[in-house]
């Protein structure tokens, strides 16, 4: 199956269009066929008026894109991948994955060819490059470049072509034996830096896309200047590393693709991410030795802080529960400063008391024994009270056979029964007194009769 091969050409990049299957067209004229539907006056030239003013019209009815207005997309940053050299344009020709030696294709492996084809076809270059030619003079003044949906395609298309050109240059430099490798590496690094500065200068000016002034922290210009300043110190490090490296080193000096340069803004963002939590505080243990990042030579002296394991600490949270049964407090209202001091002292006292009052095992066992003894005695008392009620119920004639009689009924019936028994007792006592008197009388009469008979 045939794909595409990247071939270097010595012509300047301005002569090569981004897509060979589409011709250069000015798509501003495509709106002329539907212009009467958008404007009342057919003779009005809307795009010319906007290009002269270089500002968006104030009336929403004059611009259909005003309804979809969003913040413009900033231009893409220059590529940081390895092996970028002097600018050269990319021609697209069919080739096969067999790796023939003709045409310089034998130096590419299958994985490299697939990666180049993926980057060529996967970057939406066809969808982005057919709109208009970026080398055209009217490209910067085009109305589509100021729209939020089309403002980022030009820089992406240029960077795709530069990426494809860089792969072949890097492979040729690494594949061909060169006795003066240190000199070639120095020239490659210097060309790489020049290409980065050229790519940054060829990006779209943000003032064209978004003419209104922004803050220093959010303006795209400041981002571009930060990028250029981040790349500027890397040239010294690259040159110094090439001078210190031996001549016979088999590996050329290239920048790592997956490691972006670390700047001071990255370290500041990582420091801002370390926040404290109220109950569980997260702390980072600092390593004894500072570890510098040797993987990316474009760090420019900034070292990334090492990632250390997180340590969770439990903090004491004092909870104060209100005692509703206590009488209202009569303390005086202290000032705010004194109240804060007293509260802090009280909290510290509670913490110290909680630490000190760790009860020994002996006191715990004694409390358990006391509690068990109290439970046993309470159970015995309840059982005795129940048995006494049952005995009282059995003494009452009305409740003698009623096993489900409640305690209140038992007490009432027992009280009535006691009163009746006491009344009967008084009656019997009075009868006994009468009988005693009768007996005394009879005794006295019998004594008289006996004396008379004698």
Curated annotation (Swiss-Prot):
Domain of life assignment:
Eukaryota
The entry's biotechnology remark is: POU5F1/OCT4, SOX2, MYC/c-Myc and KLF4 are the four Yamanaka factors. When combined, these factors are sufficient to reprogram differentiated cells to an embryonic-like state designated iPS (induced pluripotent stem) cells. iPS cells exhibit the morphology and growth properties of ES cells and express ES cell marker genes.
Question: Is rRNA-binding there in the keyword field?
Answer: no
Which modifications occur after translation, per UniProt? Phosphorylated by PRKDC. Phosphorylation at Ser-344 by PIM2 leads to the stabilization of MYC. Phosphorylation at Ser-77 by CDK2 prevents Ras-induced senescence. Phosphorylated at Ser-77 by DYRK2; this primes the protein for subsequent phosphorylation by GSK3B at Thr-73. Phosphorylation at Thr-73 and Ser-77 by GSK3 is required for ubiquitination and degradation by the proteasome. Dephosphorylation at multiple sites by the PNUTS-PP1 complex promotes MYC stability by preventing ubiquitination by the SCF(FBXW7) complex.
SUPFAM superfamilies xref list: HLH, helix-loop-helix DNA-binding domain
- InterPro entries given in the database record: bHLH_dom (IPR011598), HLH_DNA-bd_sf (IPR036638), Myc-LZ (IPR003327), Myc_transcription_factors (IPR050433), Tscrpt_reg_Myc (IPR002418), Tscrpt_reg_Myc_N (IPR012682)
Q: Where is this region: Basic motif?
A: 369-382
Upon changing residue 74 to A, the result is: In a Burkitt lymphoma sample
Please give the residue positions where the record annotates the modification Phosphothreonine. 23, 73, 330
Record's GO cellular component terms? axon; chromatin; euchromatin; Myc-Max complex; nuclear body; nucleolus; nucleoplasm; nucleus
Record's compositionally biased regions (Basic and acidic residues): 281-293
Segment Disordered: which positions? 219-310
Impact of mutating residue 73 to A? Impairs interaction with FBXW7 and subsequent degradation by the proteasome. Normal inhibition of Ras-induced senescence
Q: Which cysteines are joined by disulfide bonds?
A: none
- Annotated Acidic residues bias: 266-278
List modified residues, type Phosphoserine.
Answer: 21, 77, 86, 96, 166, 174, 176, 308, 329, 344, 359, 362-363
- In this chain, the stretch annotated as Leucine-zipper covers 428-449
Q: Name one GO biological process term.
A: negative regulation of fibroblast proliferation
Query: Which GO terms label this protein's molecular function in UniProt?
Result: core promoter sequence-specific DNA binding; DNA binding; DNA-binding transcription activator activity, RNA polymerase II-specific; DNA-binding transcription factor activity, RNA polymerase II-specific; DNA-binding transcription factor binding; DNA-binding transcription repressor activity, RNA polymerase II-specific; E-box binding; identical protein binding
* Domain comment quoted from the record: The 9aaTAD motif is a transactivation domain present in a large number of yeast and animal transcription factors.
**Which disorder is it connected to?**
A chromosomal aberration involving MYC may be a cause of a form of B-cell chronic lymphocytic leukemia. Translocation t(8;12)(q24;q22) with BTG1. Burkitt lymphoma: A form of undifferentiated malignant lymphoma commonly manifested as a large osteolytic lesion in the jaw or as an abdominal mass.
Other remarks? Answer: Alternative translation initiation from an upstream, in-frame non-ATG (CTG) codon or a downstream ATG start site results in the production of 2 isoforms with distinct N-termini, shown in this entry as isoforms 2/3 and isoform 1, respectively.
Protein function: Transcription factor that binds DNA in a non-specific manner, yet also specifically recognizes the core sequence 5'-CAC[GA]TG-3'. Activates the transcription of growth-related genes. Binds to the VEGFA promoter, promoting VEGFA production and subsequent sprouting angiogenesis. Regulator of somatic reprogramming, controls self-renewal of embryonic stem cells. Functions with TAF6L to activate target gene expression through RNA polymerase II pause release.
In Swiss-Prot or TrEMBL terms, this protein is called Myc proto-oncogene protein
């Amino acid at each position: 199956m045939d794909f595409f091969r990247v071939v270097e050409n010595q012509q300047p990049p301005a002569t090569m269009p981004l897509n060979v299957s589409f011709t250069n067209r000015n798509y501003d004229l495509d709106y002329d066929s539907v212009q009467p539907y958008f404007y009342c006056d057919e003779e009005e030239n809307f795009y010319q008026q906007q290009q002269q003013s270089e500002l968006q019209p104030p009336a929403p009815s004059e611009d259909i894109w005003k309804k979809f207005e969003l913040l413009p997309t900033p231009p893409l940053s220059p590529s940081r991948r390895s092996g970028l050299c002097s600018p050269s344009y990319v021609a697209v020709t069919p080739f096969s994955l067999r790796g023939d030696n003709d045409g310089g294709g034998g130096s590419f492996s299958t994985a490299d060819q697939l990666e180049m084809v993926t980057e060529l076809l996967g970057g939406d270059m066809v969808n982005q490059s057919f709109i208009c030619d970026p080398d055209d003079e009217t490209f910067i003044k085009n109305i589509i470049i100021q729209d939020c949906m089309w403002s980022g395609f030009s820089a992406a298309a240029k960077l795709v072509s530069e990426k494809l050109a860089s792969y072949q240059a890097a492979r040729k430099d690494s594949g061909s034996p060169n006795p003066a490798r240190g000199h070639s590496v120095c020239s490659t690094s210097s060309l790489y830096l020049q290409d980065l500065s050229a790519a940054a200068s060829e990006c779209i000016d943000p003032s064209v896309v978004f003419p209104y002034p922004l803050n220093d922290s959010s303006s795209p210009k400041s981002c571009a200047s930060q990028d250029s300043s981040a790349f500027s110190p890397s040239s010294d490090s690259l040159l110094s590393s090439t001078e210190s490296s031996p001549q016979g080193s088999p590996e050329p000096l290239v920048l790592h693709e997956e490691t972006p340069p670390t700047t001071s803004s990255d370290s500041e963002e990582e420091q801002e991410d370390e926040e404290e939590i109220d109950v569980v505080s997260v702390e980072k243990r600092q390593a004894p030795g500072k570890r510098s990042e040797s993987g990316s030579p474009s760090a420019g002296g900034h070292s990334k802080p090492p990632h250390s394991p997180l340590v969770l600490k439990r903090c004491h949270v004092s909870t104060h529960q209100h005692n509703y049964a206590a009488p209202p407090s009569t303390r005086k209202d202290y000032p705010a400063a004194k109240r804060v001091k007293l509260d802090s002292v009280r909290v510290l006292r509670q913490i110290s008391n909680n630490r000190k009052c760790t009860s020994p095992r002996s006191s715990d066992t004694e409390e358990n024994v006391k509690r068990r003894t109290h439970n046993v005695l309470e159970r015995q008392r309840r059982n005795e009270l129940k048995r006494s009620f049952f005995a009282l119920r059995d003494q009452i004639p009305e409740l003698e056979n009623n096993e489900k009689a409640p305690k209140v009924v038992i007490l009432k019936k027992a009280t009535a029964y006691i009163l009746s028994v006491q009344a009967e007792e008084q009656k019997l006592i009075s009868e006994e007194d009468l009988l005693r008197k009768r007996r005394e009388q009879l005794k006295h009469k019998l004594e008289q009769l006996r004396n008379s008979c004698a």
